[in-house]
Amino acid sequence: MVDTESQKEKNHLNHKIYLDYNATTPPAREVVGTVAEALQEAWGNPSSSYTAGCKAKELIDTARARIAKMVGGKPEDIIFTSGGTEANNMVLFSAVENFNRTSKERQNNNVDWALPHIITSNVEHDSVALPLLQLQKTHKAEITFVPVSTVTGRVEVEDVISAVRPNTCLVSIMLANNETGVIMPVGELSQCLASLSRKRSAQGLPEILLHTDAAQALGKVEVDVQELGVNYLTIVGHKFYGPRIGALYVGGLGHQSPLLPMLYGGGREGNFRPGTENTPMIAGLGQAAELVSLHCAAYEVHMRRIRDYLEQKLEAVFGDRIRLNSRFPGAERLPNTCNVSLLKPAVLGREWLSHCQYLQASVGAACHSDRGDSPSPVLLKSGVPQDAARSAVRLSVGRETSQDDVDLIVRDLEQAAQLLGMNKQS
């Protein structure tokens, strides 16, 4: 009789087990079908009146409505973009340009001369952090990077409010961190900023707008722009089983929340984002959003159960040889994210993964894959000790990850650790 565990491993020999869903997700079957259908039947220009063009416009309108429903907004507040990077850049540069334009209208000498000031956290994705650094470098804006708490792993509301200046025009805080999974208190922050902005208005000071990059949260936890109270929210399709395009929610587009185009050309997307629309990818994004609207609660329950099972198995097998880096007291985290370090033997996270037979995962954010063997800055800033940060591996489960997958992966990580231990001794 064949040993059950051995049979499971044999069944996995021909495929790898993917646990890097925070980096990207495979397109859902329904999304692939929608994209293929649009390529065949809706290839026309959406601005034209013939059948293929009308079909394209219909698909785009449907997708816009579906994406708005997913985040609790209105269809007219959704702008399609090439991805999260473009959406984030649009918000940041719009805030700067809007401050400069409206400063001429304000009658307050305290801010007339000042550069616009933007507040963010020190653990943001590069698509927020690097544009802000560029604005700072070119003397177009003042930037404050508020440190996250090394206890909770999140940016604290009082620290953000303390950083506000008379010339502050925007706060940009991610909704959930891609490496630790920590969920930031954006809703609480928005309430404080709204109260503060009312006082500032009476003083002739600029309103403080609020942006959140929701790339990691969508499809894992419920996201509602009304509850969050944000002006802007970034949407990234490939993080929730959609295609690699994005969208930007802008509450009260053009009047309540200013937005300025970064590109100029044909009058698409309300003149905010020119260029003929990418109908198949937009339709696919809409389909992915519809799946989230229908099933997000079930996705969250499943991923949390599998993630918790993964951490229990890791603790049972490794004991004090590992450190779970994404457990922060007093902070919520994404239901799918486990950041773990192998402490004994002391190895690099990259080395641990390279000795695994089945596991496909990463040591952190894909945008930092060029940093070599240096520890993750996000983990260090979140209070993870340097030795643990150097050996960290990010394991992020998905909608279809099973307990059988976890069982095999934990054994895979264990045999990899044993091999590394023997190599260290020899």
Swiss-Prot record:
Keywords: Cytoplasm, Lyase, Pyridoxal phosphate, Transferase. Its cofactor is pyridoxal 5'-phosphate. It catalyses: L-selenocysteine + AH2 = hydrogenselenide + L-alanine + A + H(+). It is found in: Cytoplasm, Cytosol. The active site is at C367. Its EC number is 4.4.1.16. Its main location: cytoplasm. GO terms for molecular function: selenocysteine lyase activity; transferase activity. The keyword Nucleotidyltransferase does not apply. Transmembrane segments: none annotated. The modification N6-(pyridoxal phosphate)lysine is found at K239. Homodimer. Belongs to the class-V pyridoxal-phosphate-dependent aminotransferase family. Catalyzes the decomposition of L-selenocysteine to L-alanine and elemental selenium. This is Selenocysteine lyase.
